[in-house]
Amino acid sequence: MAVPKRKTSPSKRGMRRSADALKAPTYIEDKNSGELRRPHHIDLKTGMYRGRSVLPAKD
């Protein structure tokens, strides 16, 4: 069984756990419609992704 050679300091433990905190989701303004959407996601209203029509637009 693997055993740590040194005790993990509170600083190292905290730095490792800092990535576990919940973060607010990021939104960007769409260039075409001006609405907010998640980065790297399809705009569901227009059906566009990276300048191309991927889905039929919702009316």
Curated annotation (Swiss-Prot):
Disordered: annotated segments: 1-41
Biased composition annotated in UniProt, kind: Basic and acidic residues: 28-41
GO biological process: translation
UniProt-listed SUPFAM superfamilies: Zn-binding ribosomal proteins
This protein's GO CC annotations: large ribosomal subunit
Extent of Basic residues compositional bias: 1-16
Identification of the protein by name: Large ribosomal subunit protein bL32
Organism per entry: Bartonella henselae (strain ATCC 49882 / DSM 28221 / CCUG 30454 / Houston 1) (Rochalimaea henselae)
Gene that encodes it: rpmF
